[in-house]
Regions:
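Interdomain "pre-motor" coupling segment immediately N-terminal to P-loop NTPase/helicase cores
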Residues: 11, 16-67
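N-terminal pre-Walker A segment at the start of P-loop NTPase domains
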Residues: 70-94
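Conserved hydrophobic/aromatic pocket- or pore-lining residues that grip, position, or stack substrates
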Residues: 75, 117, 135
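Walker A/P-loop nucleotide-binding motif
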Residues: 100-116
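Loop/turn-to-beta-strand initiation segments
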Residues: 101, 128-130, 161-164, 192-198
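Post-Walker A helix-loop "phosphate-sensing" segment adjacent to the P-loop in P-loop NTPases
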Residues: 121-134
Length: 258
């Protein structure tokens, strides 16, 4: 068997990184002094690393982050906001995901909720958790269109199945009765087997009223599906009169969401 034949077979098996590394070994005289087992181990390591990197890129691309540049290390703790650094660092380990616990990030417009949520989402991707970002208004539109088109189950699964789901602009607008049913169904499917990150301008205590309060038979049921054992980050200002939008701090276009 010729070396070219070996490389062709590696490429046919989609072991492209290994094929490229094998070609490099053949062209480098120094590798002749390295035992076969070590050479083969290097080839396997290169292919393995390539596949892991490609998988990570796929996860990040499919997540659809609003702010894909978000980085947990770049969260600004000196911008006049009250932030629990210890809690944020603990959440960055993604232990809450293996525990199937939720995360509530609340605060005023421009305080950095979306950036923080995307940063947590990026950490989830780095640990190879299937992650999805979506604005709640967009999700509800998707489900309404899918109901009309006969694809409701498929679209619902698209949002129910990810290990981590980031729901931005959570309850920014009060949902209709039909939308409440969709929200309940989604959160019921995700309960105790996945983690959801909720980003909202409203503090948790206000969510019940945003869901219709006593007039809605589903308000209690929805809150019950998400409230237990949740982590909560409420981003508040130290000096509201001198606040600087986190869009400016992170160098984002001011027309973007937080």
């Amino acid at each position: 068997m010729t070396n070219q034949s070996t490389m062709d077979k590696l490429i046919e098996m989609r072991l492209t990184a290994m094929a490229d590394a094998f070609r490099s070994q053949l062209n480098d005289p120094k590798f002749k002094e390295i035992p076969f087992e070590d050479q083969f181990g290097m080839l396997v390591d290169i292919e393995y690393s390539s596949r892991k990197n490609n998988r990570l890129k796929r996860l990040i691309r499919n997540a659809g982050f609003d702010q894909p540049e978000a980085n947990i290390m770049d969260i600004n703790y000196a911008s006049g906001r009250k932030l629990n650094k210890e809690l944020i660092r603990r959440l960055a380990t993604c232990e809450y995901i293996s525990e199937h616990r939720n995360l509530f990030i609340t605060g005023a417009t421009g305080c950095g909720k979306t950036y923080m949520a995307c940063a947590f989402g990026m950490e989830a991707c780095k640990q190879y958790y299937n992650t999805k970002y979506i604005r709640l208004p967009d999700l509800l539109i998707d489900l309404e269109v899918a109901r009309t088109d006969g694809n409701y189950k498929k679209v619902m699964a698209k949002y129910a199945n990810p290990v981590v789901l980031i729901l931005d602009e959570w309850l920014l607008l009060k949902p209709t009765e039909s939308e409440q049913r969709d929200i309940f169904e989604l959160l019921h499917r995700r309960r105790k087997k996945s983690s959801t990150i909720f980003c909202s301008q409203y503090e948790f205590e206000e969510w019940y009223d945003q869901l219709g309060g006593d007039d809605s038979p589903l308000a209690d049921a929805i809150i019950d599906r998400i409230a237990h054992d949740s982590y909560r980050i409420n981003i508040t200002s130290i000096d509201a009169e001198h606040d600087i939008s986190m869009r400016e701090v992170y160098g984002l276009d001011k027309t973007l969401r937080e």
